[in-house]
Each structure stands twice: as structure tokens, then as C-alpha cells.
Regions:
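Compact alpha-helical subdomains of small soluble proteins
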Residues: 22-30, 41, 56-115
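Globin-like tetrapyrrole-binding proteins
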Residues: 50
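Cell-wall glycan-active module
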Residues: 53
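Bacterial Sec-dependent signal peptides at the C-terminal "C-region" and cleavage site
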Residues: 12-23
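Small-residue packing motifs within transmembrane alpha-helices
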Residues: 2-5, 45
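Surface-exposed ligand/attachment interfaces on beta-rich extracellular proteins
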Residues: 34-39
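Sec-dependent N-terminal signal peptides
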Residues: 4-12
């Protein structure tokens, strides 16, 4: 009987444990190294374009509430501040060939958590 209860408990735990959805992100057009080679104007244009792209994610089915942190955080910053955040983050990255779209998301997410 003890074994049966243990087995039932194990099955319940396994089935109740939330599964995480795997998401594949395409590499995009630029690497972290490409960003460092951009002019200041290009860096500001890139980061604001990246944010604009993330803000239209609901068009592709992303829940709008998932963007609240980005709207709140980026709405308080200038394009210069956003580019500065990304520049610092990219310089600290060990992999210059990292996909810039993912690096940008991570940089913004980290910066916004500290505000």
C-alpha cells in the first residue's frame, strides 16, 4: 500500500509540474560585434527599432501583458540611454558573435529589473 501511495504521489507530481515551452529565436541580422562597429546614430536607431519590434509582438500572438515591463521601462528612457545600456552589456559579453536580437532583449530585461 505504501508503494502504491508513493507511486500515485510521484505520478501526480510529474503531471502537475508545469512544462516550459521551448522557444526558438531566429538569429536576426546582426551580431554583438556588429553593434560595437556601428556609429552612435546607428546604435540608437538599432535599439529603438528593436524595442518597436518587441512592442508589436502581440500581432504575432504574444500576450500583451508580457510587454508591460518593456513599455514601463523603455518609456522612461531616451534613445541615448537605451543605446548606452546595450553598449555596456555588449562590451561585457564574452561572445562577440552572439545574436544581437537576443543580446538586446537580455540587456533590456536586466536593466529594467534594476530600475
Amino acid at each position: 500500500m505504501k508503494y502504491l501511495l508513493a507511486l500515485v504521489a510521484l505520478i501526480v507530481v510529474i503531471n502537475v509540474h508545469p512544462t516550459q515551452q521551448t522557444v526558438k529565436i531566429s538569429p536576426g541580422f546582426f551580431t554583438a560585434k556588429d553593434y560595437l562597429d556601428m556609429t552612435d546614430t546607428e546604435k540608437r536607431a538599432y535599439v529603438t527599432g528593436q524595442i518597436n519590434g518587441m512592442l508589436v509582438a502581440p500581432f504575432f500572438g504574444a500576450p500583451e501583458e508580457n510587454l508591460a515591463w518593456l513599455k514601463t521601462c523603455s518609456g522612461k528612457m531616451s534613445d541615448e540611454q537605451l543605446a548606452s545600456i546595450l553598449s555596456r552589456y555588449v562590451r561585457d559579453q564574452p561572445n562577440p558573435q552572439a545574436n544581437l536580437n537576443v543580446v538586446t532583449f537580455n540587456a533590456l530585461r536586466e536593466a529594467c529589473r534594476h530600475q
